[in-house]
Amino acid sequence: MRIEEDLKLGFKDVLIRPKRSTLKSRSDVELERQFTFKYSGQTWSGVPIIAANMDTVGTFEMAQALAGFDILTAVHKHYTVEEWAAFINTASADVLKHVMVSTGTSDADFEKTVQILALNPALNFVCIDVANGYSEHFVQFVAKAREAWPTKTICAGNVVTGEMCEELILSGADIVKVGIGPGSVCTTRVKTGVGYPQLSAVIECADAAHGLGGMIVSDGGCTMPGDVAKAFGGGADFVMLGGMLAGHEESGGSVVEENGEKFMLFYGMSSESAMNRHVGGVAKYRAAEGKTVKLPLRGPVGNTARDILGGLRSACTYVGASRLKELTKRTTFIRVQEQENRIFNSL
């Protein structure tokens, strides 16, 4: 046993220090980025935000809506091959360019993903997702996926430390998904005591990944547009959002009514709700590591997407970054004990 003495930080622990700017308007900021990925060789351009691969966020409907904003969607792994085929038959090439195919690490998951990718060559992204990316089995699966799909861009996670980020990149991942426990409906940290404050994880993993020519996506911990800006400022190439995109018409959650008001269910993918729905319940040897919440219906996701992108543009203007690409270089974080004046937050 040992204790690391250096303090690790989350998004709530910092603010971005403003700097002189020559920008005249938020409209001058370019949020689109262009990436060429280490192994696939694919070049992609768009806004590097990803809707999370949760079945109450990463739906086909979400992909259709967010493609209009140049945003990616990691479509959840619980759609059947037949449902994928129906979606592909109606989706435009531009929508498919903004879709990631999610998979687990079982043999059945692999075979299903093979079938889905064979439906259309425009499906260029694979998101290999497990809660704990530290297992040898997971690393071996990433290597297997790279061998099977040499021209696909592979995103793999989740991890939170530089050395594991490096191992996944060396095993074939183009992008490493970073985050253990920061999600709004994740309870891993309280159930297990395991985790890592998200901003520090992003900073450390970005440094490790970029040294090898890889990239990272910050997954979890964002509660507002300012957190998205902080994730990019900390070095994230992509930012994945779950709770911020939940509760919308396109989110796919079940709608319930209480006292005449309608709510949408949103749950973590290791929650009892998710396991009851997809694997017949919580196995005797494990505990649920997620919760279920009821969110007031939030209407079309487009309004939220515009708010997030607007906040991101504004953050760039405050530090003089004319392009999102410049935000990291122009970010100085300051440690704080307050974020906002909360006097009217309860109203």
UniProtKB/Swiss-Prot annotation:
User: Carries keyword Amino-acid biosynthesis?
Assistant: no
Q: Active site annotated at which positions?
A: 186
Where, in this chain's numbering, is NADP(+) bound?
108-131, 216-239
Pfam families, from UniProt? IMPDH
The residues that the entry says bind K(+) are 181, 183
The family this protein is said to belong to: Belongs to the IMPDH/GMPR family. GuaC type 1 subfamily.
What PANTHER family does this protein map onto? Answer: GMP REDUCTASE (PTHR43170:SF5)
Summarizing the function annotation, the protein's role is: Catalyzes the irreversible NADPH-dependent deamination of GMP to IMP. It functions in the conversion of nucleobase, nucleoside and nucleotide derivatives of G to A nucleotides, and in maintaining the intracellular balance of A and G nucleotides.
Subunit info here reads: Homotetramer.
Q: What is this protein called?
A: GMP reductase
Q: Which organism is it from?
A: Salmonella paratyphi C (strain RKS4594)
What's the encoding gene here? guaC
